[in-house]
Amino acid sequence: MTPTNVKTRFAPSPTGRMHLGNLRTALFNALLARSRGGRFLLRLEDTDESRSSGAHAQTLMADLRWMGLHWDEGPEAGGEAGPYHQSERGAVYERYYRALEAADQAYPCFCTERELELSRKAQRAAGKPPRYAGTCAHLTAEERERRRAEGRRPTLRFRVPAEETVVFHDLVRGEQRFPTDEIGDFIIRRADGTAAFFFCNAVDDALMGVSHVLRGEDHLTNTPRQLLLLRALDLPQPEYGHINLITGDDGAPLSKRNGSLSVAELREAGWLPEAVLNYLARLGHHYTGEVESQLLDLQGLADAFRTDALGRAPARFDRHQLSHWQQLAVHRADEATLAPWLERLDDAVPADRRRALLAAVRDNILFPDDLAAWGQRVFGPLPALAPDTEAVIRDAGPAFYEAALAELETTAGDFPALAKAVRKATGAKGRQLFMPLRAALTGLCRGPELGPVYALMPVDIARCRLEQARELAATTP
């Protein structure tokens, strides 16, 4: 296969917000396509009418665009293999259903859910894995008509060939073997006439020219069923790779309870898409060499992407690692990227000083809320001081702050000049000079370089804080 023939896809169901697991699946497929000069397709699997909605579909596509994952083919992008909403492909599926029935490779099943559950219970009681018992596999035409006359609405089941073994090479897990006798005939059309996942997912991949499918390992047992379907329909079979699942700190599958976030929540909190992409690209995929620690754009991530570097062990979500990439992304971000953060600042921060504030504290913030907190520290009343900050102020003593107040007017906005004057007046130097000034002016013992921060601080606010520090230093704990 030449690189230009590679086509991957992301095929979500638009039934709710997109979370990290689905986002990583989309990313890996996009990276695989771009790493080989191929195409990335988006298909919306919206056959579940009770849960799918147009609003969810629009949100999902907006999330992908925000992350920079633009599809080459699919909804709104067009393409020759559409439509790309499964809800619009009923006639396509019906054609292949008829072909399977004509070849006696599919049959109507009239079993009720209660009958199926009783059968499964009996199989478990006998120590056998539950699978369809074949109750309707060989009904005569008369028996089928009688059941229809009783008002039973049949599903359509695929007839799985007996005594075979489905063998395929998984791009992540190597050779996989599944005896067909352990599969059982499975539903390909629901009783309401809608297409079941096994069927429409496989047929659409084939008809849309998808060559490679990366999806979660929870789909591994679906693959032999889909390969059997494609073989029966004489349709091309893609190469499959089943990636590891993401788990939380507790080792359980990632969920809202143990740390999962939706893309919408990430965006609202101020996570930058570059940070999320760089973290997820390394969550279950190992980059080597210089690129391992570099913040890369999408093409850079794709250039170093390899399916043989995809891991099999569960990928544990690590928020600290995600924060590391956020720090790199914030440091590298241009003014336009962080402009929305400025708009979220409190009115107390003068509009003409917002960019300077961002520049002063950029290396010490990760999110818009962090910037807002620094806006408060520079232009508003300080929050309550931590015990270690109070201790620094008391250790400096009231005379230290009296000296600072005496020099305030002549050194307004010029921290080096203020520090020099206080040093001359008190003899303090090093940590004994800078730490008490930082503690009094910002309410913290550590933070960004104090010069740019002090240059932004109004003189009356600086005076008030030095006076408060003088009063605190004169008290005993």
Curated annotation (Swiss-Prot):
<dbReference type="GO" id="GO:0004818">
    <property type="term" value="F:glutamate-tRNA ligase activity"/>
</dbReference>
<dbReference type="GO" id="GO:0008270">
    <property type="term" value="F:zinc ion binding"/>
</dbReference>
<dbReference type="InterPro" id="IPR020751">
    <property type="entry name" value="aa-tRNA-synth_I_codon-bd_sub2"/>
</dbReference>
<feature type="binding site">
    <location>
        <position position="111"/>
    </location>
    <ligand>
        <name>Zn(2+)</name>
    </ligand>
</feature>
<feature type="short sequence motif" description="'HIGH' region">
    <location>
        <begin position="12"/>
        <end position="22"/>
    </location>
</feature>
<dbReference type="InterPro" id="IPR049940">
    <property type="entry name" value="GluQ/Sye"/>
</dbReference>
<dbReference type="GO" id="GO:0005524">
    <property type="term" value="F:ATP binding"/>
</dbReference>
<feature type="binding site">
    <location>
        <position position="256"/>
    </location>
    <ligand>
        <name>ATP</name>
    </ligand>
</feature>
<feature type="binding site">
    <location>
        <position position="136"/>
    </location>
    <ligand>
        <name>Zn(2+)</name>
    </ligand>
</feature>
<dbReference type="InterPro" id="IPR014729">
    <property type="entry name" value="Rossmann-like_a/b/a_fold"/>
</dbReference>
<keyword id="KW-0547">Nucleotide-binding</keyword>
<keyword id="KW-0963">Cytoplasm</keyword>
<keyword id="KW-0648">Protein biosynthesis</keyword>
<dbReference type="InterPro" id="IPR000924">
    <property type="entry name" value="Glu/Gln-tRNA-synth"/>
</dbReference>
<keyword id="KW-0030">Aminoacyl-tRNA synthetase</keyword>
<keyword id="KW-0479">Metal-binding</keyword>
<dbReference type="InterPro" id="IPR020058">
    <property type="entry name" value="Glu/Gln-tRNA-synth_Ib_cat-dom"/>
</dbReference>
<dbReference type="InterPro" id="IPR045462">
    <property type="entry name" value="aa-tRNA-synth_I_cd-bd"/>
</dbReference>
<feature type="short sequence motif" description="'KMSKS' region">
    <location>
        <begin position="253"/>
        <end position="257"/>
    </location>
</feature>
<dbReference type="InterPro" id="IPR001412">
    <property type="entry name" value="aa-tRNA-synth_I_CS"/>
</dbReference>
<comment type="function">
    <text>Catalyzes the attachment of glutamate to tRNA(Glu) in a two-step reaction: glutamate is first activated by ATP to form Glu-AMP and then transferred to the acceptor end of tRNA(Glu).</text>
</comment>
<keyword id="KW-0436">Ligase</keyword>
<dbReference type="GO" id="GO:0005829">
    <property type="term" value="C:cytosol"/>
</dbReference>
<keyword id="KW-0862">Zinc</keyword>
<dbReference type="InterPro" id="IPR008925">
    <property type="entry name" value="aa_tRNA-synth_I_cd-bd_sf"/>
</dbReference>
<protein>
    <recommendedName>
        <fullName>Glutamate--tRNA ligase 2</fullName>
        <ecNumber>6.1.1.17</ecNumber>
    </recommendedName>
</protein>
<comment type="subunit">
    <text>Monomer.</text>
</comment>
<dbReference type="Pfam" id="PF00749">
    <property type="entry name" value="tRNA-synt_1c"/>
</dbReference>
<dbReference type="Pfam" id="PF19269">
    <property type="entry name" value="Anticodon_2"/>
</dbReference>
<feature type="binding site">
    <location>
        <position position="138"/>
    </location>
    <ligand>
        <name>Zn(2+)</name>
    </ligand>
</feature>
<keyword id="KW-0067">ATP-binding</keyword>
<dbReference type="InterPro" id="IPR004527">
    <property type="entry name" value="Glu-tRNA-ligase_bac/mito"/>
</dbReference>
<dbReference type="GO" id="GO:0006424">
    <property type="term" value="P:glutamyl-tRNA aminoacylation"/>
</dbReference>
<comment type="similarity">
    <text>Belongs to the class-I aminoacyl-tRNA synthetase family. Glutamate--tRNA ligase type 1 subfamily.</text>
</comment>
<feature type="binding site">
    <location>
        <position position="109"/>
    </location>
    <ligand>
        <name>Zn(2+)</name>
    </ligand>
</feature>
<dbReference type="GO" id="GO:0000049">
    <property type="term" value="F:tRNA binding"/>
</dbReference>
